[in-house]
Design a protein with these regions (language model features):
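Amphipathic alpha-helical oligomerization/scaffold segments
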Residues: 149-152
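N-terminal leader/linker segments that precede catalytic domains of diphosphate-processing enzymes
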Residues: 1-61, 65-83, 87-97, 101-125, ...
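Acidic, glycine-rich loop-and-strand cores that form catalytic or ligand-binding grooves
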Residues: 126-144
């Protein structure tokens, strides 16, 4: 699968749904694309394990909290991409923005509000991960075409909480789930591409994640 000129234009033309609501954390991420041997690839990182990081060990796109010095959420995404993986993104690399996403509600408040920005540099990036990154992978978007990669994931801190997920590399415990998977589901929907790795019912569960509520005791 290749995100070509027509798909890039569709992303450029899209007007994202931006919904400011109360959340514990406000963050922004960069979805960085490149053309690989077998189609479009996305840069993902596996976060280093750290007891103070709520996303410890998880697969994610480069990104992080919006800081006071950031001009806007896109500036946050660009800054975090450089700090975490050494990717120097410019204005020419920017394609567009996807819909804002929210994490689970914890005691009635969204855990995180994420702004999602898409970039496609026309050059090879020199990447240098920092201490926050355990591993990096250029993930072929075609992974989302293979139903065999799907499974039902149990939240590591609340086994009663299950959700659709996609296995990237079982030997490294690299799993695509929750917010990162929802971002790619939004990208597929924008491009009008079927995401064949998940059934329609599973995609419905994914869309409904924002409406699910958990207590803080269950996730701490």
């Amino acid at each position: 699968m290749l995100i070509g000129a027509s798909e890039i234009q569709r992303i450029r033309d899209y007007r994202p749904r931006v919904r400011p609501q109360e959340s514990v954390i406000k963050a922004a991420v960069s979805i960085i694309l490149r053309d690989g041997e077998h189609g479009t690839e996305l840069l993902m990182m596996q976060r280093a394990k750290h007891e103070d990081d709520p996303w410890s060990g998880q697969m994610s796109f480069p990104g992080g909290k919006i800081e006071r010095q950031d001009a806007d959420s896109k500036a946050t995404a660009v800054r975090e991409a450089f700090e975490e993986v050494g990717a120097e993104l410019t204005g020419d690399d920017f394609i567009g923005q996807l819909d804002d996403l929210y994490g689970l509600k914890i005691n009635g408040v969204f855990s995180v509000h994420v702004a999602c920005f898409v970039f496609k540099p026309q050059r090879e990036l020199t990447l240098q991960p920092n201490y926050e990154v355990a591993d990096m992978v250029w993930l072929p978007i075609s992974v989302l075409d293979d139903r065999d990669n799907a499974f039902d994931y149990r939240h590591p801190k609340d086994p009663a909480l299950s959700m659709p997920a996609v296995m990237i590399d079982q030997s490294k415990d690299q799993i695509l789930w929750d917010l990162s998977l929802r971002m790619l589901a939004n990208l597929h929907e924008l491009l009008e591409w079927p995401m064949q790795v998940l059934t329609e019912a599973e995609q419905g569960v994914l869309k409904d994640m924002e409406t699910r509520k958990v207590s803080r005791e269950n996730i701490e």
